[in-house]
Amino acid sequence: MSFKPLHDRIAIKPIENEEKTKGGIIIPDTAKEKPMQGEIVAVGNGVLNKNGEIYPLELKVGDKVLYGKWAGTEIEIKGEKLIVMKESDVFGIIN
């Protein structure tokens, strides 16, 4: 993949939810929730402050993160679905 987000944006590859419940019930596609966690695959350079200095982003490629259900914009590059959002739309890093 060759995609570089600009400024304070990040690209996330969503981690799909399970297709079965713990009890073994298969969840149809129409009933699945949108993923709310994913792995960061690309980050922008950071944000410019008033003095023209760049503040680098706290998140980095490889971080697994939790984000809002409706955050970001879905895109597709070379058949891979990604979500692009601002770093501030991420709730936190999953350890």
From Swiss-Prot:
Triggers of expression: By heat shock.
UniProt xrefs under InterPro entries: Chaperonin_GroES, Chaperonin_GroES_sf, Chaprnonin_Cpn10_CS, GroES-like_sf
Primary location: cytoplasm
GO cellular component: cytoplasm
Record key words, sorted: Chaperone, Cytoplasm, Stress response
Top-level taxon of origin: Bacteria
GO terms under biological process: chaperone cofactor-dependent protein refolding
Compartmental location: Cytoplasm
GO molecular function, one term: unfolded protein binding
Pfam family, one: Cpn10
Quaternary structure note: Heptamer of 7 subunits arranged in a ring. Interacts with the chaperonin GroEL.
Function comment: Together with the chaperonin GroEL, plays an essential role in assisting protein folding. The GroEL-GroES system forms a nano-cage that allows encapsulation of the non-native substrate proteins and provides a physical environment optimized to promote and accelerate protein folding. GroES binds to the apical surface of the GroEL ring, thereby capping the opening of the GroEL channel.
Family: Belongs to the GroES chaperonin family.
Name listed for the protein in its UniProt record: Co-chaperonin GroES
Organism: Rickettsia typhi (strain ATCC VR-144 / Wilmington)
